[in-house]
Amino acid sequence: MFSSDENLFNFIVFFILVMAFPTFILCQFFTSPYGKHYTSADSGTTISPPIAWAFMESPTLWLTIIVFRLGKNYTNPLAFLLISPYLFHYTNRTIIYPLRLRSRNTKNNFPLNIAVTAFIFNLLNAYIQSRWVSHYANYQEDDWFWVRFGIGLVIFGSGMLLNIWADGVLLGLKSQGGGYKIPRGGLFDYVSSPNYLGEIMEWLGWALMTWSWAGLAFFVYTCANLVPRAVSNHKWYLQKFGEDYPKNRKAVFPFLY
């Protein structure tokens, strides 16, 4: 079907970019039933959330490393530098975050079909991100590399810190027992899902650092997936807590949306 690696690479980039649109539309009407949106009636076979997160995010580590070593630029220090933020994020998401979940005695309520779907997406995405950085990026003729990398890294790093902090707040509330509570403090005073805002910022920074269609496709798909889910989270909080929930909060972008 594909006459060359470049054709395969371009097809996957195009596929992810195009799939962002139907994903965004679908997410207006259907919220994936995990986390606070879990319902046993809609979920089918379920597994432990820590196992689900470790499984579905795992290609972002092992496949990234395998593909990276196959690229013509894998010995280039700039390629190592560029892939590092990506690996930092997914080390947290694949290893550290599941361990933090495990310590909270979570129930087996993560749908297996969602974990498998996310695993497949991460296979495709890890391939194109690692392949671009290690093989197709032209470091020798990129005069703006350091400018874009510096600005992108600031955005990425700020988003990652926000994402980790917000996850910590939510996990801390869960560990208190007694059901869901209203998260407060920091950006939780402005949006219902600062963890999603942080992740959107990360992949905006990544798209800027890589300056590639692969990075852009990932950022666009992230927005298509997380923005509607943030809106669903916001509606869920309003329905659950009613008048007690702060009315000035937005869903994901402070003061805007």
UniProtKB/Swiss-Prot annotation:
Record's keyword terms, sorted: Membrane, NADP, Oxidoreductase, Transmembrane, Transmembrane helix
Stretches that traverse the bilayer: 11-31, 47-67, 78-97, 110-130, 151-171, 200-220
Compartment(s) of residence: Membrane
Gene3D superfamilies, A to Z: 1.20.120.1630
InterPro entries (alphabetical): 3-oxo-5-alpha-steroid_4-DH, 3-oxo-5_a-steroid_4-DH_C, SRD5A/TECR
Regulation affecting activity: Repressed by steroid (4-MA, VG106, PD91, PD17, Finasteride) and non-steroid (AS601811, AFA27, AFA76, AFA131, AFA192) inhibitors; steroid inhibitors are generally more efficient.
Catalytic activity: a 3-oxo-5alpha-steroid + NADP(+) = a 3-oxo-Delta(4)-steroid + NADPH + H(+)
Coiled-coil stretches: none
Pfam families: Steroid_dh
Keyword Transmembrane: yes
One cellular component term from this protein's GO annotations in UniProt: membrane
GO biological process, one term: brassinosteroid biosynthetic process
Tissue specificity comment: Mostly expressed in leaves and hypocotyls and, to a lower extent, in stems, cotyledons, roots, seeds and callus.
UniProt function note: Involved in a reduction step in the biosynthesis of the plant steroid, brassinolide (BL). Can use progesterone, testosterone, androstenedione and campestenone as substrate.
Protein's name in the database: Steroid 5-alpha-reductase DET2
Lineage of source species: Eukaryota, Viridiplantae, Streptophyta, Embryophyta, Tracheophyta
